[in-house]
């Protein structure tokens, strides 16, 4: 397997390091505007690869992405003092355009995974710029948020996260939400499981769903406040996404996927060739309203970029 990663910052390197642990990667290319940094990170990763399957890792240029199985995008710049959100977004869309042109020129058969935020908006523009099948252009979406949710439920319920089927959907951002009506543990609705749980209250319900949902939504802010950035968990999640596709596991992930004309976090089956099926959830009336609102947030950003930048 060959993986090319645009962006050798903390997120890009965390993804690369997590990929080494899978022992599936034969070649890995790091591409960054700061070539010297990319070379240093590549060398450090190369030395660590001796602990895993042998992997050829180097800092390259756009042409080196040729014949990549997966291209991961973590590139982008941060907000400058006094700069508006739209100005920043416009610049990052332009960066995505340059990368998209590289992909079309050198490796048009790759599966593209975008990680750069706002992930849903930027993944949409990558899809537009490359004109590749949407099945092969995805974003990490709410996969990390879903992982956070399952950890919180696991701690509360005393059940392995692997046995908890609950998802965060919508925008990877403040409008994301949890459709708890679809959440299950061992085939039981989450609410029904709570009646059997040793932690249950007199009312037969041990979870404050609003608090858990808010903790998931605020998790990134909490981490950034303490360490300045989130990188390890998204690194693990992205590497797991790649290994899942490479092994053709056909697992369900809440990736950013094309749904009714825009990219948004939604449960989808992914395999060797990318997205195989988008699973339409049976949402409650309130959940449907939340989903449509989240969708409108993404749509608004897309329309702003189209009208003011291009």
Curated annotation (Swiss-Prot):
Regulation: Allosterically activated by fructose 1,6-bisphosphate (FBP).
The protein's annotated pathway: Fermentation; pyruvate fermentation to lactate; (S)-lactate from pyruvate: step 1/1
One of the record's GO cellular component terms: cytoplasm
Annotated positions binding beta-D-fructose 1,6-bisphosphate: 150, 165
Classification via Pfam families: Ldh_1_C, Ldh_1_N
Subcellular location: Cytoplasm
Binding, substrate: 79, 85, 117-120, 145-148, 230
Entry-linked InterPro entries: L-lactate/malate_DH (IPR001557), L-lactate_DH (IPR011304), L-lactate_DH_AS (IPR018177), Lactate/malate_DH_C (IPR022383), Lactate/malate_DH_N (IPR001236), Lactate_DH/Glyco_Ohase_4_C (IPR015955), NAD(P)-bd_dom_sf (IPR036291)
Predominant subcellular localization, coarse grouping: cytoplasm
Active site residues per record: 172 (proton acceptor)
Gene Ontology BP terms: glycolytic process; lactate metabolic process
EC number: 1.1.1.27
Modified residues (Phosphotyrosine): 221
Function: Catalyzes the conversion of lactate to pyruvate.
Record protein name field: L-lactate dehydrogenase
Gene source species: Fervidobacterium nodosum (strain ATCC 35602 / DSM 5306 / Rt17-B1)
């Amino acid at each position: 397997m060959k993986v090319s990663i645009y962006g050798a910052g903390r997120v890009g390197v965390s993804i690369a390091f997590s990929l080494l642990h899978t022992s599936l990667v034969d070649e890995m290319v790091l591409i960054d505007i700061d070539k010297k940094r990319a070379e240093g990170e590549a060398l450090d990763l190369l030395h660590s690869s001796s602990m895993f399957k042998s992997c050829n890792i180097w800092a390259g240029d756009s042409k080196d992405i040729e014949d990549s199985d997966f291209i991961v995008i973590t590139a982008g710049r941060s907000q400058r003092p006094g700069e508006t959100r739209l100005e920043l977004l416009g610049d990052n869309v332009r960066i995505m355009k340059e990368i998209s042109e590289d992909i079309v020129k050198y490796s048009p058969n790759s599966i593209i995974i975008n990680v750069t935020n706002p992930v849903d908006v930027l993944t949409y523009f990558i899809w537009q710029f490359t004109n590749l099948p949407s099945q092969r252009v995805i974003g990490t979406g709410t996969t990390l948020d879903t992982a956070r949710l399952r950890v919180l439920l696991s701690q509360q319920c005393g059940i392995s996260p692997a046995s908890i089927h609950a998802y965060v959907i919508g925008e990877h951002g403040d409008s994301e939400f949890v459709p708890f009506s679809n959440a299950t543990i061992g085939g039981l609705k989450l609410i029904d499981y709570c009646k059997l749980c040793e932690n249950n209250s007199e009312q037969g319900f041990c979870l404050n769903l609003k608090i858990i949902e808010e903790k998931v939504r605020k998790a990134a802010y909490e981490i950034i406040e303490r360490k300045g950035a989130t990188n390890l968990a998204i690194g693990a999640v992205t590497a797991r996404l790649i290994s899942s596709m490479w092994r053709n596991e056909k697992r369900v992930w809440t990736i950013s996927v094309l749904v009714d004309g825009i990219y948004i976090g939604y449960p989808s089956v992914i395999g060797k060739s990318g997205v195989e099926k988008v699973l339409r959830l049976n949402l409650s009336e309130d959940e449907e309203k939340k989903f449509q609102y989240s969708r409108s947030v993404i749509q608004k950003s897309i329309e702003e970029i189209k009208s003011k930048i291009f």
